[in-house]
């Protein structure tokens, strides 16, 4: 059997537009689609819902290859079901990354627990961490708990773009729209999805403010850098169709002229300019890291940077912090010179 994800737009807010179906007969995989409907009812973002569907598609393909059916009953689940799924992924060539495996296992675990609450708990001591869970509302003693099954992920360090790389990449753009897009990523730290989701009425150029439709339906107001105001003003005056209600960044030519820029269009834009300039690491997320590093060097505090970047937890912001050994030395020397008083006398 072959399975795939289909997109079926619907006005029903309780039904997921993403469905897992058996490709030959068009039959839906009921237990997965019930879980996707549940997540849709929780109002998760469409991209998150699509990601869940893709992860569960991979899981059901594995399950069918082992059990020769996509139907799951509670009795078929064992304590090692997810561990067997991890073994399968780890044996593939080329191997999947630890983060990909963990994301798939986490989604499959949530879906199975929601659909089959009486199924055996997954047990794999080498892949789980024991901890104490707080009692509800902080009343009563903490209870022992076990984390979800996870494989170890190597720590990744994303190095920001250098000044030279940014200048070379920037110089290859010629339209006001493209310059404004890159400017919002570099000067404001916006995600690619946030840039695409902007509407014309999100801009308040006289006040130098922008309303960002953040990740997880969490909008935030941000101040605009003077350079960003200038780039956006040029785009609005010179290139964008005059429609105050339309999307901010639109296609400028072809049959889709005036329609919101698509993810494929944005990826194609960056791919073309990476090839043109030779700056192979230039992508929207790398510009976001570059923004975070520039803000820290400029003296912005971590709590303020967390708000600027739209993070819910400061631990997420710390991932974007990249400080070179030279910067550590310089900041330490400056702090010692400014704040250690009196300077101790060193005997000769």
Where are these regions (language model features)?
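Catalytic-site neighborhood detector that most strongly recognizes the C-terminal catalytic loop/helix
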Residues: 309, 314-334
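Conserved tyrosine-mediated DNA breakage-rejoining catalytic core shared by Y-recombinases
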Residues: 188, 193, 197-231
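C-terminal secondary-structure termini that scaffold catalytic or DNA-interacting sites
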Residues: 2-3, 335-348
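N-terminal core-binding DNA-recognition domain of tyrosine recombinases/integrases
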Residues: 32-47, 56-142
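Basic, Lys/Arg- and aromatic-enriched nucleic-acid-binding interface segment
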Residues: 159-192, 218, 243
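Active-site/catalytic core of tyrosine-dependent DNA strand-transfer enzymes
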Residues: 226-279
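C-terminal catalytic core of tyrosine-transesterase DNA break-rejoin enzymes
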Residues: 183, 288-312, 319
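Flexible interdomain linker/hinge and immediately adjacent N-terminus
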Residues: 120-168, 213, 252-257
């Amino acid at each position: 059997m072959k399975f795939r994800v289909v997109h079926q737009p619907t006005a029903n807010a309780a039904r997921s537009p993403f469905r897992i179906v058996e490709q030959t007969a068009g039959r839906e995989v009921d237990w997965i689609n019930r879980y996707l409907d549940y997540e849709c009812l929780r109002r998760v973002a469409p991209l998150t819902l699509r990601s869940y569907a893709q992860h569960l598609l991979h899981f059901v393909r594995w399950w069918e290859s082992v059990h020769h059916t996509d139907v799951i009953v509670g009795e078929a689940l064992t304590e090692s079901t997810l561990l067997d799924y991890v073994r399968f992924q780890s044996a593939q060539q080329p191997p999947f990354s630890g983060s990909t495996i963990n994301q798939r296992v986490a989604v499959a675990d949530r879906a199975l627990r929601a659909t089959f609450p009486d199924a055996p708990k997954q047990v794999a001591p080498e892949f789980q961490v024991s901890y104490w869970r707080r009692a509800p509302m902080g009343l009563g003693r903490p209870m022992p708990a076990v984390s979800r099954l996870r494989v170890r992920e190597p720590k990744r360090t994303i190095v920001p773009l250098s000044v030279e790389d940014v200048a070379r990449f920037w110089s290859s753009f010629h339209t006001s729209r493209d310059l404004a897009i890159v400017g919002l990523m570099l000067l404001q730290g916006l995600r690619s999805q946030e840039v695409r989701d902007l509407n014309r009425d999100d801009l308040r150029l006289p006040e130098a403010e922008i309303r960002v439709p953040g990740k997880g339906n969490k909008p935030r107001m941000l101040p605009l850098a003077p350079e960003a105001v200038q780039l956006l003003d040029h785009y609005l005056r010179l290139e964008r169709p005059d429609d105050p209600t339309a999307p901010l960044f639109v296609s400028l030519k072809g049959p889709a002229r005036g329609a919101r820029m698509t993810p494929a269009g944005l990826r194609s834009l960056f791919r073309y300019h990476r090839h043109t300039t030779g700056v192979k690491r230039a992508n929207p997320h790398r510009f976001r890291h570059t923004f975070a590093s520039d803000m820290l060097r400029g003296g912005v505090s971590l709590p303020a940077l967390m708000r600027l970047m739209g993070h819910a937890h400061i631990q997420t912001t710390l991932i974007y912090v990249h400080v070179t050994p030279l910067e550590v030395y310089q900041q330490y020397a400056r702090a010692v010179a400014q704040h250690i008083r009196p300077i101790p006398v060193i005997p000769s």
